[in-house]
């Protein structure tokens, strides 16, 4: 039976290909070290796990949850936003729970995009921005993220006819895969642009708490008027090592939050309530665990940067995310460099072209691996590459 066009149009998911490659090498007896997928290697903090255990003892929490989330969970999210960013949110109308931010990012296009509609997406960028658009029948206009512009989209370069047709704009800072950060000045430009062209801004802020060297990432919603034109997606996955728990939220524009909630009520049955209680504990409990995690990633970041720079790269230390974005050496494409490292060194990296055409010529290293294994991976890379040129 022929699949629907929307499914046939989907590109192969980047990380699915990486997982298959790892499996093939392991079956061949290779000791593979993966620096590919950004999945934290340290455990969820103990007090969050204990809260899950306690909440799971209550039989009521094993019934169907609300598709938009318990009010107490949404209140905890709103209170966290007030403490962290000074942003006031109505937990009843401006917060919705998500099965991880990925789910909401994929579904928001279903709320606003009709077949043929246009969506602005960053390139390179998280593949789900485009995937959700394709599933909704829309088309994407790629906003190039260039190093000379700090990996921020140049809004002035977007053609007038494109801007007028666009329904949504996806942005993401701190940025995956580049590690770039954005200030409030940039977000102000985005709000102005969105108001001018009546575009809904969808800011993916999943890495806002993974920052270094005293830097604190702002929320898009801190900008005056941002709630008029946008929503922000966030998650407990990266901040508290809860990727497998599948819990996050969207906040901001009440109409967009309502649309997302109505869509979800027809598709899923919400987040397991015991996990929502654990999420409340994460947001309201001790935050020193987040600082400890960032300190660990900073150490690993420094290790990678120092090693690669010794080999001939000229990399600056990113202020956010747990990724290193670097150009491939002379003579390689993104794909051929990734293939070289897996074949010669048994080390998996993510080829930059998997994030879009503007990712060609780059690769991404994830810092979510035990430091001892990271050191071994870097030793293997140094052994098989030596000095490199660009």
UniProtKB/Swiss-Prot annotation:
Task of the protein: Involved in the synthesis of meso-diaminopimelate (m-DAP or DL-DAP), required for both lysine and peptidoglycan biosynthesis. Catalyzes the direct conversion of tetrahydrodipicolinate to LL-diaminopimelate.
Enzyme Commission number(s) of this protein: 2.6.1.83
Protein name: LL-diaminopimelate aminotransferase
HAMAP family from the UniProt entry: DapL_aminotrans_1
InterPro entries from the UniProt entry: Aminotransferase_I/II_large, DAP-NH2Trfase_DapL_Desulfo, DapL/ALD1, LL-DAP_aminotransferase, NHTrfase_class1_PyrdxlP-BS, PyrdxlP-dep_Trfase, PyrdxlP-dep_Trfase_major, PyrdxlP-dep_Trfase_small
EC class: transferase
UniProt-listed GO biological process terms: lysine biosynthetic process via diaminopimelate, diaminopimelate-aminotransferase pathway
Recorded GO MF terms: L,L-diaminopimelate aminotransferase activity; pyridoxal phosphate binding
A Pfam family this chain is assigned to: Aminotran_1_2
Organism: Carboxydothermus hydrogenoformans (strain ATCC BAA-161 / DSM 6008 / Z-2901)
Keyword field: Aminotransferase, Pyridoxal phosphate, Transferase
Catalytically driven reaction(s): (2S,6S)-2,6-diaminopimelate + 2-oxoglutarate = (S)-2,3,4,5-tetrahydrodipicolinate + L-glutamate + H2O + H(+)
Pathway in which this enzyme or protein is active: Amino-acid biosynthesis; L-lysine biosynthesis via DAP pathway; LL-2,6-diaminopimelate from (S)-tetrahydrodipicolinate (aminotransferase route): step 1/1
């Amino acid at each position: 039976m022929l699949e629907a066009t929307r499914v046939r149009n989907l590109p192969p998911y980047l990380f699915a290909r990486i997982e298959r490659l790892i499996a093939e090498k392991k079956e061949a007896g290779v000791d593979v070290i993966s620096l590919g997928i950004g999945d934290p290697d340290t455990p969820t903090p103990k007090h969050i796990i204990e809260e899950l255990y306690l909440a799971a003892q209550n039989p009521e929490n094993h019934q169907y949850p609300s598709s938009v989330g318990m009010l107490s969970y949404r209140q905890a999210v709103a209170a966290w936003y007030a403490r962290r960013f000074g942003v006031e949110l109505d937990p009843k109308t401006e917060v919705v729970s998500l099965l991880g931010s990925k789910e909401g990012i994929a579904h928001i296009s279903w709320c606003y995009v009709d077949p043929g509609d246009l969506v602005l997406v960053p390139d390179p960028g998280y593949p789900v921005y485009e995937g959700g658009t394709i599933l909704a029948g829309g088309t994407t206009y790629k906003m190039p993220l260039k190093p000379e512009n700090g990996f921020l989209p140049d809004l002035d370069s977007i053609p007038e006819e494109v801007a007028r047709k666009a329904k949504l704009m996806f942005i993401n800072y701190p940025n995956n895969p580049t590690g770039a950060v954005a200030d409030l000045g940039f977000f102000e430009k985005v709000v102005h642009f969105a108001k001018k062209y009546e575009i809904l801004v969808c800011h993916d802020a999943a890495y806002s708490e993974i920052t270094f060297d005293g830097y604190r990432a702002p929320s898009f919603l801190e900008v005056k008027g941002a709630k008029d034109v946008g929503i922000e997606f966030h998650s407990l996955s990266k901040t508290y090592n809860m990727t497998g728990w599948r819990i996050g939220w969207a906040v901001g524009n009440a109409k967009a939050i309502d649309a997302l909630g109505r869509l979800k009520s027809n598709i899923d049955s919400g987040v397991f309530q015991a996990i929502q209680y654990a999420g409340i504990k994460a947001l309201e409990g001790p935050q020193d665990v987040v600082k400890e995690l960032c300190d660990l990633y900073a150490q690993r970041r420094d290790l990678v940067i120092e090693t690669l720079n010794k080999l001939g790269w000229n990399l600056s230390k990113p202020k956010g995310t747990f990724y290193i974005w670097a150009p491939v050496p002379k003579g390689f494409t993104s794909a051929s460099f990734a293939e070289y490292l897996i074949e010669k060194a048994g080390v998996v990296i993510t080829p930059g072209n998997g994030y879009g055409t503007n990712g060609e010529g780059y690769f991404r290293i994830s810092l979510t691996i035990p430091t001892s294994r990271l050191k071994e991976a870097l030793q293997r890379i140094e052994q098989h590459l030596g000095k490199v040129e660009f």
